[in-house]
C-alpha cells in the first residue's frame, strides 16, 4: 500500500478482508494518518519516557481529537517505549497520565534486543536469549487483543440494542 494507502475506499476494503489490520503511520499529520484514523478501531501512540517525548505527543493528540469529531468512539492508548531504569523512566507513567489519554498497561523498556531484531529484519519474539523483550512484546500483543475484544464486544452490544 505504502504512500498510496489513502486512496478512497482502499483502507475500507482491506479492513473488511481481515479480522485485524495493523497500520504503522508516521507520527505527524498527513493524509495517510488521517485515512488510518478514519478506519481504526484502536490507535496506539508510542511515546518515549522523557519530558521531551511527552511534549511531542501533543501533535498526535491534537490530530486524534480532530478525528474524534467524526469517530467519537475511537479508542486510543499511549504506549510508553524506550523506558529506562532511572527515576525519569519510573516516573514516566505518572507524567504521561497528565496528557488525558489512557495509557496501555504495558511498557517497553530500552532494550538492545529491539535494535538487534530490527537490524536483522525480524521480530524479537523469534530471538533466543531475550526473555524480557519477548515477554514485553507478548504482553503488548495480549493487551492489544484484550482492547480489540472489549471494543468489539461493546460494538456488538450496541448493534444488538439498535
Question: What are the roles of these predicted feature ranges?
Answer:
Residues 67-76, 86, 103:
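Short, structured loop/turn "capping" segments at alpha-beta junctions
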Residues 83-84, 94-122:
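Beta-strand-loop-alpha "switch" segments that mediate conformational coupling across diverse proteins
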Residues 29-51:
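Inter-motif core of Ras-like GTPase G domains
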Residues 124-162:
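NTP-binding/hydrolysis catalytic cores, primarily Walker-type P-loop NTPases
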Residues 57-73, 81:
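Conserved C-terminal guanine-recognition region of P-loop GTPase G domains, centered on the G4
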Residues 23, 45, 78-80:
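Structural beta-sheet core signal
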Residues 1-23, 27, 34, 58, ...:
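P-loop/Walker-type NTP enzyme "switch/lid" segment
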Amino acid at each position: 500500500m505504502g504512500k498510496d494507502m489513502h486512496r478512497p475506499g482502499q483502507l475500507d476494503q482491506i479492513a473488511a478482508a481481515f479480522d485485524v489490520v495493523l497500520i504503522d503511520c508516521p507520527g505527524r499529520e498527513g493524509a495517510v494518518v488521517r485515512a488510518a484514523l478514519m478506519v481504526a478501531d484502536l490507535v496506539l501512540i508510542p511515546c518515549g519516557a522523557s519530558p521531551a517525548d511527552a511534549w511531542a505527543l501533543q501533535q498526535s493528540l491534537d490530530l486524534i481529537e480532530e478525528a474524534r469529531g467524526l469517530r467519537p468512539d475511537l479508542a486510543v492508548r499511549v504506549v510508553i517505549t524506550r523506558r529506562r531504569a532511572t527515576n525519569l523512566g519510573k516516573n514516566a507513567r505518572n507524567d504521561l497520565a497528565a496528557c488525558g489519554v489512557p495509557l496501555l498497561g504495558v511498557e517497553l523498556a530500552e532494550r538492545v534486543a529491539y535494535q538487534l531484531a530490527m537490524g536483522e529484519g525480524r521480530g524479537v519474539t523469534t530471538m533466543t536469549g531475550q526473555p524480557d523483550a519477548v515477554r514485553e512484546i507478548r504482553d503488548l500483543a495480549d493487551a492489544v487483543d484484550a482492547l480489540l475484544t472489549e471494543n468489539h464486544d461493546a460494538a456488538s452490544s450496541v448493534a444488538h440494542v439498535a
